[in-house]
């Protein structure tokens, strides 16, 4: 039995692989690794595919200096800037997405965190969404504390999103205005508040494969529910506008490794896949079982109708 199959069988028997074993796997053939990751997904997660959409609920003028982000005040980009969206716009979007077949809907806002007044406004909006449609609500409002997260939970939010972005080791290379530990604390507080957690990161920032593996193991330790993996889309004006893009093999290997490390979780294809020539179809055969559909925060995405068609053709149930 080869190394890939040996570790696959270990996972299917109920054990978890170690970081050392993940690094060994990272040296293996990408196509064989992807096929095994798909076997793990099929055996442990089945055919169900989870689709979510996001809306940019507050855009630009962010005081954080994340090098990849078009919304940071540190960079001169062409993105639209606006304050918190009105409730009607958010509710209309939620209902529209629900009617298109999406399972989850998230409001994502720029900035380190929302103000108390803004939290009260979005909580009222979430309650109104729940009265009008059955879509599952997610939220991404920055580094909130426990009490603020409890408010979200009480308003109908089921899952809180807060990306680690990368490994602890590499984090200070992409952001210095907040810390990796602040993110960890937010995730722990969300779990304590009774919320599910969606947390992943961005690949292609200049990090190593070991950094990605480290991030995956941190997420496993935190026991998050959904792991969105974004592929860097270098945006003109940001510090990473000239960052070299990852090869599709490198991207595929990363997604497959995340399935090996987090065998029963939602490995979610997120931003950047519109850059891929097959819109991520290869990744959906490499361990992925969820995706963000539609537009991203500041870049165009893939229409939900087209996503559902492709996902069903691949044998998934949406």
Swiss-Prot record:
Positions contributing to [4Fe-4S] cluster binding: 62, 66, 69
Cofactor: [4Fe-4S] cluster; [2Fe-2S] cluster
InterPro entries linked: Aldolase_TIM, BATS_dom, Biotin_synth/BioAB, Biotin_synthase, Elp3/MiaA/NifB-like_rSAM, rSAM
Keyword field contains Iron: yes
GO molecular function: 2 iron, 2 sulfur cluster binding; 4 iron, 4 sulfur cluster binding; biotin synthase activity; iron ion binding
Binding, [2Fe-2S] cluster: 106, 138, 198, 268
Gene Ontology process terms (BP): biotin biosynthetic process
Cofactor info, note text: Binds 1 [4Fe-4S] cluster. The cluster is coordinated with 3 cysteines and an exchangeable S-adenosyl-L-methionine. Binds 1 [2Fe-2S] cluster. The cluster is coordinated with 3 cysteines and 1 arginine.
One protein family per Pfam: BATS
Catalytic activities: (4R,5S)-dethiobiotin + (sulfur carrier)-SH + 2 reduced [2Fe-2S]-[ferredoxin] + 2 S-adenosyl-L-methionine = (sulfur carrier)-H + biotin + 2 5'-deoxyadenosine + 2 L-methionine + 2 oxidized [2Fe-2S]-[ferredoxin]
Free-text function comment from the UniProt entry: Catalyzes the conversion of dethiobiotin (DTB) to biotin by the insertion of a sulfur atom into dethiobiotin via a radical-based mechanism.
Subunit structure: Homodimer.
Protein name (database record): Biotin synthase
Encoding gene per record: bioB
């Amino acid at each position: 039995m080869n190394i890939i199959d040996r570790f696959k069988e270990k996972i299917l028997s109920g054990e978890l692989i170690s970081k050392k074993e993940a690094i060994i796997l990272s040296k293996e053939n990408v196509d064989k690794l992807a096929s095994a990751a798909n076997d793990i997904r099929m055996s442990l997660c089945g055919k169900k595919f989870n689709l979510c959409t996001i809306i940019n609920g507050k855009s630009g003028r962010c005081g954080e200096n994340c090098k990849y982000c078009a919304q940071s005040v540190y960079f001169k980009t062409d993105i639209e800037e606006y304050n918190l969206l009105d409730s009607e716009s958010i509710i209309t979007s939620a209902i529209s997405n629900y009617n298109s077949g999406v399972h989850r809907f998230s409001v994502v806002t720029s900035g380190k965190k929302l103000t108390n007044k803004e939290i009260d406004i979005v909580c009222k909006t979430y309650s109104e969404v729940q009265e009008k449609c059955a879509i599952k609500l997610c939220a991404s409002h920055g580094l909130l504390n426990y009490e603020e997260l409890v408010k979200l939970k009480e308003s109908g939010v089921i899952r809180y999103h807060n990306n680690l972005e990368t490994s602890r080791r590499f984090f200070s290379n992409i952001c210095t205005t907040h810390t990796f530990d602040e993110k960890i604390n937010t995730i722990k507080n969300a779990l304590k508040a009774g919320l599910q957690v969606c947390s992943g990161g961005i690949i292609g920032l200049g990090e190593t494969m070991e950094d990605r593996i480290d991030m995956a193991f941190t997420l496993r330790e935190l026991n998050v529910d959904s792991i969105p993996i974004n592929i860097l889309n270098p945006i003109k004006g940001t510090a990473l506008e000239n960052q070299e893009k990852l090869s599709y093999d490198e991207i595929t290997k990363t997604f497959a490794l995340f399935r090996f490390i987090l065998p029963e979780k939602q490995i979610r294809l997120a931003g950047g896949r519109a850059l891929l020539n097959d819109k991520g179809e290869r990744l959906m055969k490499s361990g992925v079982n969820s995706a963000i559909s539609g537009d991203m925060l500041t870049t165009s995405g893939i229409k939900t109708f087209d996503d559902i068609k492709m996902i069903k053709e691949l044998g998934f149930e949406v």
